[in-house]
Regions:
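Acidic catalytic motifs of isoprenoid enzymes
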Residues: 19, 37, 70-91, 105
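Short, flexible active-site-proximal loops enriched in glycine and acidic residues
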Residues: 44-45, 89-97
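Divalent metal-dependent phosphate-bond-processing catalytic cores, especially two-metal-ion Mg2+/Mn2+ enzymes
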Residues: 17-43, 55, 110-226
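His-Asp-centered metal-binding catalytic motifs of divalent-metal-dependent phosphohydrolases/nucleases
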Residues: 46-66, 73, 77, 81, ...
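An amphipathic alpha-helix signature
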Residues: 7-11, 32, 75-82, 99, ...
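A short, mixed-charge helix-start or loop-turn motif at secondary-structure junctions
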Residues: 13-18, 63-64
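Short alpha-helical hairpin
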Residues: 1-12, 53
Length: 226
């Protein structure tokens, strides 16, 4: 089976099986397209990058279904990927590389990306939380979770201690206490420091400015300022 045929089969599998709202097919395809952009001109195994990107969140439903907070969707995605990749004729070396990329894409763990393919996946995945799409995703979550459109807290550390689980997935305990402003302070503005590639950092700088400017305009409108 040719590489392009294998990638198309993976795309079909992902389209048919992605059921987790937090890690849906739209997110996967955005990350996939961004990986293609970031990888232009790079000497990498493009089939490894494409396969890993398409499968990186396939285990999201398992994490969401685990109320204990001990399940890591990156680990689960790597487990699910292995037999599928074997079925499609990937070599053991490629399967191992793809699994490593998937496992290391998670922001909240110490599994750091080592290869360029893994770094590109990590960067593209994080960029999807920023910019216009980041605003859209966050406010979709805000509406679904009945959280605040606008809310700031005086002590971020105290908020984290009070409202964040220390389990592997770092879940928010009470989503109704959360807000875009809090999410920006505790995570989004720090993403750029974690990125690996210069291309991604350049994109992140632009997207962070958009996000920050949006929050500034939102605050003025909430407070009735002209």
């Amino acid at each position: 089976m040719k590489g392009s045929d294998r990638i198309e089969k993976i795309k079909k599998y992902v389209r048919d099986t992605m059921v987790c709202p937090g890690h849906n097919i739209e997110h996967v395809l955005r990350v996939y397209n961004l990986c293609l952009t970031l990888s232009k001109g790079e000497k990498i195994d493009h089939e490894v990058l494409e396969a890993a990107t398409l499968l990186h969140d396939i285990g999201g439903a398992r994490e969401m279904a685990d109320s204990t907070g001990k399940t890591d969707h990156a680990i689960e995605s790597a487990k699910i990927a292995k037999p599928l990749l074997e079925e499609f004729g990937f070599s053991e070396d490629k399967i191992s590389h793809i699994q490593d990329c998937i496992i290391s894409h998670r922001y909240k763990t110490d599994n750091k990306p080592k290869t360029l393919e893994a770094k590109l996946l990590f960067d593209a995945d994080k960029l999807d939380a920023l910019g216009a799409i980041g605003v859209a995703r966050l406010f979709a979550w805000i509406g679904k979770s009945n959280a605040h459109i606008y809310k700031k807290v005086d002590d971020i550390d105290l908020y984290l201690e009070d409202n964040f689980s220390k389990k592997i997935n770092g879940r928010i305990k009470d989503k109704t206490k959360h807000s875009p402003q809090i999410e920006y302070e505790i995570k989004l503005k720090h993403i750029i420091k974690r990125l690996n590639t210069d291309k991604a950092k350049k994109i992140a700088k632009k997207r962070l400015k958009f996000f920050k400017d949006f929050l500034g305009e939102l605050e003025k409108e909430v407070k009735g300022k002209l």
